[in-house]
Amino acid sequence: MCIRDSEYTVSFLAYIMWDPVHMYNAVTNDWKDVEHQITFDVRQPKTHEYTLKRLRKFIEDHPYVNVLRFTTFFHQFTLVFDELAREKYVDWYGYSASVSPYILKQFEEEVGYPFRAEYIIDQGYYNNQYRVPSKEFQDFQAFQRREVAKIVKEMTEITHECGKKAMMFLGDHWIGTEPFMEEFKTLGIDAVVGSVGNGSTLRLISDIEGVKYTEGRLLPYFFPDVFNENGDPVKEAKYNWVTARRAILRKPIDRIGYGGYLKLALQFPEFLDYVEQVCNEFRTLYANVKGTTPYCVKKVAVLNCWGKMRAWGCHMVHHALYQKQNYSYAGIIESLSGAPFDVVFINFQDILDNPAILDDIDVIINVGDADTAHTGGEWWENPKIIEAIRGFVYNGGGIIGVGEPSGHQYQGHFFQLANVFGVEEETGFTLGYDKYNWDEHEHFILEDSEEVDFGEGKKNIYALPSATILVQKEKEVQMAVNEFGKGRAVYISGLPYSFENSRVLYRAVLWSTHSEDELNRWFSTNYNVDVHAYPKNNKYCVVNNTDEPQQTTIYRGDGSSFELALEPNQIIWYEIA
Protein backbone atom coordinates (compact mmCIF):
# COMPACT_ATOMS: atom_id res chain seq x y z
CA MET A 1 0.00 0.00 0.00
CA CYS A 2 1.39 3.41 -1.00
CA ILE A 3 1.37 6.37 1.37
CA ARG A 4 0.34 9.70 -0.08
CA ASP A 5 3.11 12.28 -0.70
CA SER A 6 5.84 9.69 -0.21
CA GLU A 7 8.61 9.00 -2.72
CA TYR A 8 8.99 5.56 -4.23
CA THR A 9 11.47 4.05 -6.63
CA VAL A 10 10.95 1.25 -9.10
CA SER A 11 13.77 -1.27 -9.45
CA PHE A 12 14.32 -2.96 -12.78
CA LEU A 13 16.94 -4.67 -14.90
CA ALA A 14 17.81 -2.88 -18.14
CA TYR A 15 19.41 -4.69 -21.06
CA ILE A 16 22.63 -3.06 -22.32
CA MET A 17 21.96 -2.57 -26.03
CA TRP A 18 25.23 -0.77 -26.77
CA ASP A 19 28.45 -1.74 -25.07
CA PRO A 20 29.56 1.24 -22.92
CA VAL A 21 33.20 1.12 -24.06
CA HIS A 22 32.20 1.03 -27.71
CA MET A 23 29.83 3.90 -27.01
CA TYR A 24 32.60 5.87 -25.29
CA ASN A 25 34.97 5.38 -28.22
CA ALA A 26 32.26 6.32 -30.72
CA VAL A 27 31.40 9.50 -28.85
CA THR A 28 35.01 10.51 -28.13
CA ASN A 29 36.23 9.94 -31.67
CA ASP A 30 33.03 11.09 -33.40
CA TRP A 31 32.56 7.81 -35.25
CA LYS A 32 29.82 7.90 -37.88
CA ASP A 33 27.70 5.04 -39.21
CA VAL A 34 29.35 2.45 -36.98
CA GLU A 35 27.34 -0.58 -35.96
CA HIS A 36 26.72 -0.65 -32.22
CA GLN A 37 28.46 -3.52 -30.46
CA ILE A 38 26.70 -5.38 -27.68
CA THR A 39 28.25 -6.79 -24.53
CA PHE A 40 28.72 -10.56 -24.43
CA ASP A 41 27.34 -12.19 -21.29
CA VAL A 42 29.95 -14.94 -21.20
CA ARG A 43 28.36 -16.41 -18.09
CA GLN A 44 25.39 -17.69 -20.13
CA PRO A 45 25.99 -21.37 -21.08
CA LYS A 46 25.59 -20.99 -24.86
CA THR A 47 27.60 -17.76 -25.00
CA HIS A 48 30.21 -19.34 -22.76
CA GLU A 49 30.59 -22.31 -25.13
CA TYR A 50 30.66 -20.05 -28.19
CA THR A 51 33.31 -17.77 -26.67
CA LEU A 52 35.69 -20.62 -25.93
CA LYS A 53 35.32 -21.95 -29.49
CA ARG A 54 35.82 -18.44 -30.85
CA LEU A 55 39.00 -18.06 -28.79
CA ARG A 56 40.44 -21.28 -30.23
CA LYS A 57 39.54 -20.20 -33.75
CA PHE A 58 41.16 -16.79 -33.27
CA ILE A 59 44.39 -18.43 -32.14
CA GLU A 60 44.32 -20.83 -35.10
CA ASP A 61 43.69 -17.98 -37.55
CA HIS A 62 46.49 -15.81 -36.10
CA PRO A 63 49.52 -18.09 -35.66
CA TYR A 64 51.88 -15.07 -35.61
CA VAL A 65 50.31 -13.75 -32.39
CA ASN A 66 52.19 -14.89 -29.29
CA VAL A 67 50.49 -12.75 -26.63
CA LEU A 68 46.71 -12.42 -26.32
CA ARG A 69 45.64 -9.26 -24.53
CA PHE A 70 42.17 -9.72 -23.13
CA THR A 71 40.20 -6.49 -22.70
CA THR A 72 39.01 -7.82 -20.25
CA PHE A 73 37.05 -10.50 -18.29
CA PHE A 74 34.00 -9.99 -18.54
CA HIS A 75 31.92 -7.25 -16.94
CA GLN A 76 32.13 -3.53 -17.69
CA PHE A 77 32.47 -1.08 -14.82
CA THR A 78 29.45 1.18 -14.47
CA LEU A 79 29.43 3.68 -17.33
CA VAL A 80 26.18 5.26 -18.49
CA PHE A 81 25.54 8.00 -21.06
CA ASP A 82 22.41 10.10 -21.38
CA GLU A 83 20.20 10.80 -24.39
CA LEU A 84 22.45 13.75 -25.36
CA ALA A 85 25.55 11.51 -25.57
CA ARG A 86 26.92 12.98 -22.35
CA GLU A 87 28.47 10.86 -19.64
CA LYS A 88 25.77 10.50 -16.97
CA TYR A 89 27.14 8.14 -14.34
CA VAL A 90 30.51 6.48 -13.92
CA ASP A 91 32.09 4.31 -11.27
CA TRP A 92 35.36 2.62 -12.22
CA TYR A 93 34.71 0.13 -9.41
CA GLY A 94 30.98 -0.27 -10.11
CA TYR A 95 29.37 -3.72 -10.21
CA SER A 96 25.90 -2.66 -11.39
CA ALA A 97 26.56 -3.71 -15.01
CA SER A 98 27.55 -7.23 -13.97
CA VAL A 99 24.05 -8.55 -13.30
CA SER A 100 21.61 -10.64 -15.31
CA PRO A 101 18.70 -12.95 -14.42
CA TYR A 102 20.97 -15.95 -14.99
CA ILE A 103 23.70 -14.58 -12.72
CA LEU A 104 21.27 -13.58 -9.98
CA LYS A 105 19.68 -17.03 -9.96
CA GLN A 106 23.13 -18.58 -9.54
CA PHE A 107 23.87 -16.16 -6.72
CA GLU A 108 20.71 -17.10 -4.83
CA GLU A 109 21.49 -20.80 -5.14
CA GLU A 110 24.99 -20.31 -3.78
CA VAL A 111 24.39 -17.92 -0.86
CA GLY A 112 21.07 -19.42 0.23
CA TYR A 113 19.00 -16.26 0.48
CA PRO A 114 16.91 -14.37 -2.11
CA PHE A 115 18.52 -11.58 -4.07
CA ARG A 116 17.01 -8.11 -3.75
CA ALA A 117 17.61 -5.36 -6.29
CA GLU A 118 18.38 -3.00 -3.43
CA TYR A 119 21.60 -4.93 -2.77
CA ILE A 120 22.91 -3.38 -5.99
CA ILE A 121 20.88 -0.17 -6.29
CA ASP A 122 21.72 0.86 -2.73
CA GLN A 123 19.30 3.82 -2.50
CA GLY A 124 20.58 5.02 -5.86
CA TYR A 125 24.23 5.16 -4.77
CA TYR A 126 25.04 1.82 -6.42
CA ASN A 127 27.53 0.81 -3.74
CA ASN A 128 30.16 3.26 -4.91
CA GLN A 129 33.35 3.03 -2.89
CA TYR A 130 32.28 5.84 -0.55
CA ARG A 131 29.43 3.71 0.75
CA VAL A 132 30.09 1.43 3.69
CA PRO A 133 29.50 -1.93 1.94
CA SER A 134 26.69 -4.15 3.15
CA LYS A 135 27.19 -7.84 3.84
CA GLU A 136 24.92 -8.70 0.90
CA PHE A 137 26.92 -6.58 -1.53
CA GLN A 138 30.18 -8.06 -0.31
CA ASP A 139 28.66 -11.52 -0.75
CA PHE A 140 27.76 -10.58 -4.32
CA GLN A 141 31.27 -9.30 -5.04
CA ALA A 142 32.81 -12.48 -3.66
CA PHE A 143 30.42 -14.56 -5.77
CA GLN A 144 31.34 -12.58 -8.89
CA ARG A 145 35.05 -13.00 -8.20
CA ARG A 146 34.68 -16.77 -7.91
CA GLU A 147 32.55 -17.16 -11.03
CA VAL A 148 34.67 -14.82 -13.15
CA ALA A 149 37.80 -16.66 -12.02
CA LYS A 150 36.45 -20.02 -13.23
CA ILE A 151 35.87 -18.84 -16.80
CA VAL A 152 39.06 -16.78 -16.97
CA LYS A 153 40.97 -19.90 -15.96
CA GLU A 154 39.34 -21.82 -18.83
CA MET A 155 40.42 -19.13 -21.30
CA THR A 156 43.98 -18.86 -20.05
CA GLU A 157 44.34 -22.65 -20.13
CA ILE A 158 43.29 -22.65 -23.79
CA THR A 159 45.75 -19.82 -24.44
CA HIS A 160 48.60 -21.70 -22.80
CA GLU A 161 47.62 -24.97 -24.44
CA CYS A 162 48.10 -23.23 -27.79
CA GLY A 163 51.53 -21.95 -26.77
CA LYS A 164 50.51 -18.34 -26.21
CA LYS A 165 50.73 -15.92 -23.27
CA ALA A 166 47.66 -14.34 -21.68
CA MET A 167 47.70 -10.65 -20.80
CA MET A 168 44.88 -8.80 -19.07
CA PHE A 169 44.05 -5.12 -19.52
CA LEU A 170 43.20 -3.57 -16.15
CA GLY A 171 40.27 -1.48 -17.28
CA ASP A 172 37.03 -1.57 -19.25
CA HIS A 173 35.40 -4.98 -18.60
CA TRP A 174 37.53 -5.81 -15.54
CA ILE A 175 34.83 -6.05 -12.86
CA GLY A 176 35.15 -9.27 -10.88
CA THR A 177 38.84 -9.86 -11.54
CA GLU A 178 39.96 -7.78 -8.51
CA PRO A 179 43.77 -8.09 -8.82
CA PHE A 180 44.45 -7.65 -5.09
CA MET A 181 42.11 -10.42 -3.95
CA GLU A 182 42.96 -14.09 -3.51
CA GLU A 183 40.95 -15.33 -6.52
CA PHE A 184 43.19 -13.42 -8.92
CA LYS A 185 46.07 -15.79 -8.28
CA THR A 186 44.00 -18.64 -9.74
CA LEU A 187 43.30 -16.94 -13.10
CA GLY A 188 46.45 -18.10 -14.88
CA ILE A 189 47.23 -14.61 -16.18
CA ASP A 190 50.80 -14.08 -17.39
CA ALA A 191 50.78 -10.28 -17.42
CA VAL A 192 48.71 -7.20 -16.66
CA VAL A 193 48.68 -3.90 -18.54
CA GLY A 194 46.85 -0.77 -17.48
CA SER A 195 46.59 2.95 -18.06
CA VAL A 196 48.81 5.19 -15.94
CA GLY A 197 47.24 8.51 -14.99
CA ASN A 198 49.33 9.25 -11.90
CA GLY A 199 51.35 7.53 -9.19
CA SER A 200 48.33 5.88 -7.59
CA THR A 201 47.16 4.27 -10.83
CA LEU A 202 50.73 3.16 -11.49
CA ARG A 203 50.74 1.32 -8.17
CA LEU A 204 47.37 -0.22 -9.09
CA ILE A 205 49.36 -2.11 -11.71
CA SER A 206 52.84 -2.55 -10.28
CA ASP A 207 51.66 -3.90 -6.92
CA ILE A 208 49.79 -6.81 -8.53
CA GLU A 209 51.30 -10.15 -7.52
CA GLY A 210 51.19 -13.51 -9.25
CA VAL A 211 52.02 -12.41 -12.81
CA LYS A 212 55.24 -12.66 -14.80
CA TYR A 213 55.30 -8.98 -15.72
CA THR A 214 53.32 -5.76 -15.55
CA GLU A 215 53.04 -2.99 -18.11
CA GLY A 216 51.95 0.63 -17.86
CA ARG A 217 50.28 2.46 -20.71
CA LEU A 218 51.47 6.03 -20.37
CA LEU A 219 49.52 9.12 -21.36
CA PRO A 220 48.51 10.86 -23.48
CA TYR A 221 46.54 8.49 -25.66
CA PHE A 222 47.12 9.13 -29.36
CA PHE A 223 43.63 10.58 -29.75
CA PRO A 224 42.47 13.77 -31.52
CA ASP A 225 41.61 15.52 -28.25
CA VAL A 226 45.35 16.00 -27.59
CA PHE A 227 47.03 15.39 -30.95
CA ASN A 228 45.68 18.40 -32.80
CA GLU A 229 47.02 21.78 -33.90
CA ASN A 230 46.14 23.33 -30.54
CA GLY A 231 47.29 20.40 -28.39
CA ASP A 232 50.59 19.96 -26.57
CA PRO A 233 51.28 16.22 -26.31
CA VAL A 234 54.87 16.78 -25.14
CA LYS A 235 53.71 18.79 -22.13
CA GLU A 236 51.17 16.13 -21.19
CA ALA A 237 53.71 13.35 -21.68
CA LYS A 238 56.26 15.08 -19.44
CA TYR A 239 53.77 15.59 -16.65
CA ASN A 240 52.58 11.99 -16.90
CA TRP A 241 56.07 10.51 -16.91
CA VAL A 242 57.40 12.56 -14.00
CA THR A 243 54.27 11.80 -11.96
CA ALA A 244 54.45 8.07 -12.72
CA ARG A 245 58.22 7.93 -12.21
CA ARG A 246 57.89 8.65 -8.47
CA ALA A 247 55.79 5.51 -8.08
CA ILE A 248 57.91 3.42 -10.46
CA LEU A 249 60.93 4.13 -8.27
CA ARG A 250 59.09 2.57 -5.33
CA LYS A 251 57.52 -0.39 -7.15
CA PRO A 252 58.50 -0.69 -10.81
CA ILE A 253 56.37 -1.95 -13.64
CA ASP A 254 58.27 -4.15 -16.09
CA ARG A 255 57.34 -2.45 -19.37
CA ILE A 256 55.95 0.85 -20.60
CA GLY A 257 53.99 1.72 -23.72
CA TYR A 258 51.47 4.05 -25.31
CA GLY A 259 48.15 3.54 -27.09
CA GLY A 260 45.98 5.14 -29.75
CA TYR A 261 46.30 6.10 -33.41
CA LEU A 262 49.96 5.90 -34.42
CA LYS A 263 49.40 8.15 -37.43
CA LEU A 264 48.53 11.01 -35.07
CA ALA A 265 51.78 10.65 -33.11
CA LEU A 266 53.80 10.68 -36.33
CA GLN A 267 52.62 14.24 -36.93
CA PHE A 268 54.49 15.39 -33.79
CA PRO A 269 58.21 14.55 -34.17
CA GLU A 270 59.14 16.39 -30.95
CA PHE A 271 56.77 14.06 -29.12
CA LEU A 272 58.51 11.02 -30.60
CA ASP A 273 61.87 12.42 -29.48
CA TYR A 274 60.59 12.82 -25.93
CA VAL A 275 59.19 9.28 -25.90
CA GLU A 276 62.62 7.99 -26.92
CA GLN A 277 64.10 9.88 -23.97
CA VAL A 278 61.53 8.38 -21.61
CA CYS A 279 62.24 4.86 -22.88
CA ASN A 280 65.98 5.22 -22.37
CA GLU A 281 65.45 6.61 -18.87
CA PHE A 282 63.10 3.75 -18.03
CA ARG A 283 65.59 1.12 -19.20
CA THR A 284 68.27 2.51 -16.88
CA LEU A 285 65.81 2.82 -14.01
CA TYR A 286 64.55 -0.72 -14.44
CA ALA A 287 68.04 -2.19 -14.61
CA ASN A 288 68.93 -0.49 -11.33
CA VAL A 289 65.85 -1.28 -9.23
CA LYS A 290 64.28 -4.51 -10.53
CA GLY A 291 64.34 -7.37 -8.08
CA THR A 292 65.07 -5.33 -4.98
CA THR A 293 63.07 -3.65 -2.23
CA PRO A 294 63.70 0.08 -1.84
CA TYR A 295 64.60 1.56 1.53
CA CYS A 296 61.43 2.10 3.58
CA VAL A 297 61.65 4.31 6.63
CA LYS A 298 58.33 3.11 8.12
CA LYS A 299 55.39 0.76 7.53
CA VAL A 300 52.12 2.61 6.98
CA ALA A 301 48.63 1.09 6.99
CA VAL A 302 45.73 2.88 5.31
CA LEU A 303 42.60 1.87 7.25
CA ASN A 304 39.16 1.91 5.62
CA CYS A 305 36.23 -0.43 4.92
CA TRP A 306 37.75 -1.86 1.73
CA GLY A 307 41.33 -2.69 2.67
CA LYS A 308 43.45 -4.38 0.02
CA MET A 309 40.50 -4.76 -2.36
CA ARG A 310 40.72 -1.04 -3.16
CA ALA A 311 44.44 -0.63 -2.61
CA TRP A 312 45.74 2.49 -4.35
CA GLY A 313 42.24 3.24 -5.65
CA CYS A 314 40.94 4.94 -2.52
CA HIS A 315 38.91 8.08 -3.30
CA MET A 316 38.99 7.32 -7.03
CA VAL A 317 35.63 7.79 -8.77
CA HIS A 318 36.88 7.75 -12.34
CA HIS A 319 40.36 6.70 -13.39
CA ALA A 320 42.69 9.39 -11.96
CA LEU A 321 40.27 12.25 -12.62
CA TYR A 322 40.08 15.31 -10.36
CA GLN A 323 37.10 15.76 -8.07
CA LYS A 324 36.75 18.92 -5.97
CA GLN A 325 35.17 16.94 -3.16
CA ASN A 326 37.98 14.40 -2.78
CA TYR A 327 41.28 15.80 -4.07
CA SER A 328 42.19 16.86 -0.53
CA TYR A 329 42.05 13.16 0.44
CA ALA A 330 43.25 11.50 -2.76
CA GLY A 331 46.43 13.55 -2.33
CA ILE A 332 47.39 11.37 0.63
CA ILE A 333 47.25 8.21 -1.50
CA GLU A 334 49.14 9.91 -4.33
CA SER A 335 51.87 11.06 -1.93
CA LEU A 336 52.18 7.55 -0.50
CA SER A 337 52.56 6.06 -3.99
CA GLY A 338 56.02 7.62 -4.31
CA ALA A 339 57.07 7.89 -0.67
CA PRO A 340 59.73 5.76 1.08
CA PHE A 341 57.20 3.77 3.09
CA ASP A 342 56.04 0.17 3.06
CA VAL A 343 52.34 0.83 2.42
CA VAL A 344 49.57 -1.67 3.13
CA PHE A 345 45.79 -1.33 3.03
CA ILE A 346 43.69 -2.93 5.76
CA ASN A 347 40.00 -2.93 6.65
CA PHE A 348 38.14 -3.07 9.94
CA GLN A 349 37.25 -6.74 9.50
CA ASP A 350 40.97 -7.51 9.21
CA ILE A 351 41.45 -6.06 12.70
CA LEU A 352 38.55 -8.07 14.14
CA ASP A 353 39.80 -11.27 12.54
CA ASN A 354 43.39 -10.73 13.63
CA PRO A 355 44.18 -7.91 16.08
CA ALA A 356 47.87 -8.84 15.76
CA ILE A 357 47.78 -7.39 12.24
CA LEU A 358 48.71 -4.06 13.84
CA ASP A 359 51.82 -5.44 15.55
CA ASP A 360 54.16 -4.74 12.64
CA ILE A 361 52.52 -1.44 11.65
CA ASP A 362 54.21 1.85 12.55
CA VAL A 363 51.48 4.29 11.50
CA ILE A 364 47.75 4.03 10.78
CA ILE A 365 46.19 6.53 8.36
CA ASN A 366 42.42 7.12 8.34
CA VAL A 367 41.38 9.65 5.68
CA GLY A 368 38.07 10.89 4.33
CA ASP A 369 34.68 12.29 5.25
CA ALA A 370 32.59 11.04 8.15
CA ASP A 371 30.30 8.06 7.66
CA THR A 372 31.93 7.00 4.41
CA ALA A 373 33.70 3.73 3.73
CA HIS A 374 37.00 5.58 3.84
CA THR A 375 36.67 6.54 7.49
CA GLY A 376 34.49 3.66 8.69
CA GLY A 377 31.05 4.89 9.70
CA GLU A 378 29.28 2.44 12.02
CA TRP A 379 32.42 0.34 12.39
CA TRP A 380 33.44 2.81 15.11
CA GLU A 381 30.53 1.60 17.26
CA ASN A 382 32.31 -1.74 17.66
CA PRO A 383 34.19 -1.66 21.00
CA LYS A 384 36.77 -4.14 19.72
CA ILE A 385 37.76 -1.72 16.95
CA ILE A 386 38.03 1.17 19.41
CA GLU A 387 40.04 -0.97 21.81
CA ALA A 388 42.44 -2.14 19.10
CA ILE A 389 43.12 1.31 17.62
CA ARG A 390 43.36 3.17 20.93
CA GLY A 391 45.55 0.43 22.33
CA PHE A 392 47.80 0.57 19.28
CA VAL A 393 48.41 4.30 19.75
CA TYR A 394 48.54 4.23 23.56
CA ASN A 395 51.29 1.62 23.45
CA GLY A 396 53.48 3.68 21.13
CA GLY A 397 51.99 3.55 17.64
CA GLY A 398 51.37 6.53 15.40
CA ILE A 399 48.11 7.59 13.79
CA ILE A 400 47.36 10.25 11.18
CA GLY A 401 43.80 11.39 10.52
CA VAL A 402 42.80 13.51 7.54
CA GLY A 403 39.43 15.18 7.07
CA GLU A 404 36.96 13.58 9.46
CA PRO A 405 38.85 10.51 10.73
CA SER A 406 36.70 8.17 12.83
CA GLY A 407 33.81 10.55 12.12
CA HIS A 408 30.48 9.07 13.23
CA GLN A 409 28.04 10.55 15.74
CA TYR A 410 27.86 8.08 18.62
CA GLN A 411 27.86 8.17 22.41
CA GLY A 412 28.67 11.84 22.84
CA HIS A 413 31.34 12.22 20.17
CA PHE A 414 31.52 12.94 16.45
CA PHE A 415 35.17 11.88 16.17
CA GLN A 416 35.21 8.51 17.91
CA LEU A 417 38.96 8.97 18.40
CA ALA A 418 38.62 12.57 19.61
CA ASN A 419 40.76 11.96 22.70
CA VAL A 420 43.43 10.31 20.52
CA PHE A 421 43.64 13.05 17.89
CA GLY A 422 43.01 15.82 20.40
CA VAL A 423 40.42 17.45 18.14
CA GLU A 424 36.67 17.30 17.69
CA GLU A 425 34.18 18.63 15.16
CA GLU A 426 31.53 21.11 16.22
CA THR A 427 28.19 19.84 14.95
CA GLY A 428 26.11 22.17 17.09
CA PHE A 429 25.82 19.75 19.99
CA THR A 430 28.72 21.34 21.91
CA LEU A 431 28.23 25.02 21.08
CA GLY A 432 27.52 25.71 24.74
CA TYR A 433 31.04 24.66 25.72
CA ASP A 434 33.74 27.35 25.53
CA LYS A 435 36.94 26.50 23.67
CA TYR A 436 40.20 28.17 24.74
CA ASN A 437 42.93 26.25 22.90
CA TRP A 438 43.63 28.37 19.78
CA ASP A 439 47.34 29.27 19.92
CA GLU A 440 49.52 28.09 17.01
CA HIS A 441 52.93 26.51 17.62
CA GLU A 442 56.03 25.85 15.55
CA HIS A 443 56.67 22.17 14.94
CA PHE A 444 58.96 19.60 13.35
CA ILE A 445 56.26 18.65 10.84
CA LEU A 446 56.20 22.14 9.31
CA GLU A 447 59.90 22.97 9.27
CA ASP A 448 60.14 22.62 5.46
CA SER A 449 56.86 24.40 4.73
CA GLU A 450 55.80 27.97 4.28
CA GLU A 451 51.99 27.97 4.07
CA VAL A 452 50.41 24.53 3.86
CA ASP A 453 47.77 23.95 1.21
CA PHE A 454 44.93 22.12 2.96
CA GLY A 455 42.79 22.01 -0.18
CA GLU A 456 39.13 22.20 0.76
CA GLY A 457 40.08 21.73 4.40
CA LYS A 458 37.45 21.24 7.09
CA LYS A 459 35.32 23.73 8.95
CA ASN A 460 34.32 23.66 12.61
CA ILE A 461 37.24 21.60 13.93
CA TYR A 462 38.36 22.64 17.41
CA ALA A 463 41.18 21.45 19.65
CA LEU A 464 40.80 19.74 23.00
CA PRO A 465 42.98 21.08 25.83
CA SER A 466 45.63 18.36 25.37
CA ALA A 467 46.32 19.11 21.71
CA THR A 468 49.00 21.32 20.17
CA ILE A 469 47.68 23.40 17.28
CA LEU A 470 50.01 23.85 14.33
CA VAL A 471 47.61 25.72 12.03
CA GLN A 472 44.18 27.25 12.62
CA LYS A 473 42.27 29.64 10.41
CA GLU A 474 39.58 31.83 11.95
CA LYS A 475 39.34 29.47 14.91
CA GLU A 476 39.02 26.37 12.76
CA VAL A 477 41.84 23.89 13.30
CA GLN A 478 43.59 22.74 10.12
CA MET A 479 46.47 20.83 11.70
CA ALA A 480 47.15 19.65 15.24
CA VAL A 481 49.15 17.02 17.09
CA ASN A 482 48.47 15.15 20.29
CA GLU A 483 50.24 12.78 22.66
CA PHE A 484 48.18 9.75 23.70
CA GLY A 485 49.88 7.40 26.14
CA LYS A 486 53.20 6.43 24.56
CA GLY A 487 51.88 7.19 21.07
CA ARG A 488 51.34 10.24 18.92
CA ALA A 489 48.52 11.44 16.69
CA VAL A 490 48.43 13.98 13.86
CA TYR A 491 45.27 15.64 12.57
CA ILE A 492 45.20 17.34 9.14
CA SER A 493 42.06 18.85 7.61
CA GLY A 494 43.09 17.96 4.04
CA LEU A 495 46.28 17.49 2.05
CA PRO A 496 46.11 17.72 -1.77
CA TYR A 497 49.01 16.21 -3.65
CA SER A 498 52.03 18.43 -4.12
CA PHE A 499 55.75 18.02 -3.49
CA GLU A 500 55.52 20.30 -0.46
CA ASN A 501 52.56 18.42 0.98
CA SER A 502 54.32 15.11 0.41
CA ARG A 503 57.09 16.45 2.63
CA VAL A 504 54.51 17.44 5.26
CA LEU A 505 53.14 13.88 5.24
CA TYR A 506 56.66 12.43 5.42
CA ARG A 507 57.49 14.51 8.46
CA ALA A 508 54.12 13.67 10.04
CA VAL A 509 54.91 9.96 9.76
CA LEU A 510 58.34 10.45 11.33
CA TRP A 511 57.00 12.58 14.18
CA SER A 512 54.10 10.25 14.94
CA THR A 513 56.58 7.38 15.37
CA HIS A 514 59.07 9.33 17.54
CA SER A 515 61.54 9.13 14.66
CA GLU A 516 62.59 12.74 14.12
CA ASP A 517 66.22 11.65 14.36
CA GLU A 518 65.78 9.52 11.22
CA LEU A 519 65.01 12.51 9.00
CA ASN A 520 68.47 12.93 7.49
CA ARG A 521 68.76 9.46 5.99
CA TRP A 522 68.34 9.13 2.23
CA PHE A 523 66.89 12.63 2.30
CA SER A 524 66.85 15.83 0.23
CA THR A 525 66.52 19.19 1.97
CA ASN A 526 64.65 20.44 -1.12
CA TYR A 527 61.16 18.92 -1.22
CA ASN A 528 61.12 19.15 -5.03
CA VAL A 529 63.85 16.51 -5.09
CA ASP A 530 63.47 12.89 -3.96
CA VAL A 531 66.05 10.33 -2.89
CA HIS A 532 65.42 6.59 -3.34
CA ALA A 533 67.84 3.97 -2.07
CA TYR A 534 68.19 0.30 -3.02
CA PRO A 535 70.65 -1.18 -0.50
CA LYS A 536 70.47 -4.71 -1.95
CA ASN A 537 71.65 -3.41 -5.34
CA ASN A 538 74.05 -0.86 -3.83
CA LYS A 539 72.28 1.90 -5.75
CA TYR A 540 70.54 5.14 -4.95
CA CYS A 541 69.15 7.90 -7.10
CA VAL A 542 68.33 11.58 -6.79
CA VAL A 543 65.34 12.83 -8.78
CA ASN A 544 64.26 16.34 -9.75
CA ASN A 545 60.47 16.20 -10.00
CA THR A 546 60.12 19.65 -11.56
CA ASP A 547 60.63 21.38 -14.91
CA GLU A 548 63.11 23.77 -13.30
CA PRO A 549 66.73 23.44 -12.10
CA GLN A 550 66.99 22.58 -8.41
CA GLN A 551 69.68 22.95 -5.76
CA THR A 552 69.67 20.71 -2.70
CA THR A 553 71.64 18.98 0.02
CA ILE A 554 71.51 15.19 -0.20
CA TYR A 555 71.86 12.98 2.89
CA ARG A 556 73.04 9.41 2.46
CA GLY A 557 71.96 6.53 4.64
CA ASP A 558 74.88 7.03 7.06
CA GLY A 559 74.00 10.70 7.58
CA SER A 560 76.81 12.10 5.42
CA SER A 561 75.79 14.74 2.90
CA PHE A 562 76.75 16.59 -0.27
CA GLU A 563 75.48 19.53 -2.30
CA LEU A 564 73.90 18.88 -5.68
CA ALA A 565 72.51 20.88 -8.58
CA LEU A 566 70.03 19.14 -10.89
CA GLU A 567 68.71 19.99 -14.32
CA PRO A 568 64.94 19.98 -14.98
CA ASN A 569 63.42 16.48 -14.52
CA GLN A 570 66.89 15.01 -14.11
CA ILE A 571 67.55 11.68 -12.41
CA ILE A 572 71.10 10.81 -11.28
CA TRP A 573 72.20 7.35 -10.19
CA TYR A 574 74.93 6.64 -7.62
CA GLU A 575 76.64 3.64 -6.08
CA ILE A 576 76.27 3.13 -2.34
CA ALA A 577 79.83 3.20 -1.02
Model feature map: region roles:
Residues 56, 69-72, 77-80, 130-131, ...:
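Hydrophobic targeting/anchoring helices
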Residues 79-82, 86-89, 263-297, 337, ...:
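Extracellular ligand-binding/catalytic regions of CAZymes and related secreted enzymes
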Residues 376-451:
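A glycine-rich, often tryptophan-bearing local segment used as a flexible ligand/cofactor-contacting loop or short
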Residues 357-364:
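Short acidic/histidine-rich motifs immediately flanking catalytic phosphotransfer sites
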Residues 168-177, 333-357:
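A short, well-structured beta->alpha microelement
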